[in-house]
Amino acid sequence: MSRRCAGTRTDARDCARIAELLECGLLHGSFIPSAEQKEVRDLTRYRMKTVQARTSEIQRLHKALESAGIKLGSVLSDITGVSGRLMIDALIDGERRAQVMADLAKGTLRQAGKQADLSMALAARFTDHHAMLCRLHRDQIKLADHAIAGLDAQIADRAGRWPRELGLLDSVPGFGDVVSAAWLAEIGPAPHRWFPSHGKLASWVTLCPGNNISARKRKHGRTGDAGTYIKPVLVQAAWAAIRVRGRLQARYRRLVRRFGGDKNPGAKKKAIIAIAHTLLKIAYQVLKTGQPYTDLGADFYTRRQSPEQQQAYLARRLQKLHPGCTVTITISPPPGSPPPSAPAEAA
């Protein structure tokens, strides 16, 4: 075989090779969304960008308030909530008395301790320049809220073409209207048509571990950078799913312990990626089989263990609580019950 000269183009040979593979049926078609999916995809992606822009405006509003010495973020969990908006509107309109603005708080923020914290957080050097900046950021946030509400209505209208698939996805923990619409837009109502297994789909979404092995040494297994739109949505759904008592919450806690727990700062992030991978598999199977998801319960992993394994696990936990002591588990009948009869001796 002659060596190829440098600079020689191989396009013709590459095309011939591709044609041979296609003729033999060795090439599979790529995933091409339908026209209906593309419409929903345009809306869901624009909604994601609008939400990100809104978040950036909130951060700029935080910065403007902090530059004036106002520490609302240290008292309020969300400065764009009802109480936060009322106080910011009062600041923009020219109110400078801290106690008057603190009295605008609603709900639990009207408690005596919270009122004192709000008064301290609002006592600052807020000038007309800061008011102008806050007004601009507030108006942009309102525009984003209005745009997001309109997009939600349009997405719900177009995603209503797949009522059966929406009902199936709604049974998956962590899946709501936004996540289900994003799934239908990015992956489609029938993922098994394009992806023969959930593993292939996970690889396409880049929610599978990286396979980086060299000289029999396994290097970092971080996921890829693709799946820009559907991957963050599934991770967001995973954070919501682990808040509900069930198998996914139990699996998350087991994974955090396996990855090092509190000793490893990245244990929770690794575990949440694994939960997102599990959600992808569940959604794939739900749409493939047409059966809604049924949770196996928070004690799923405990039921798989024998009584001896459960006793050994409890003994190890007690040993960690009382180091240096010997832990012995004794099983006795409940009070008032007759003692167990001794086995009869053989004649």
Task: Give residue ranges: language-model regions.
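A detector of single, family-specific signature residues
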Residues: 1-347
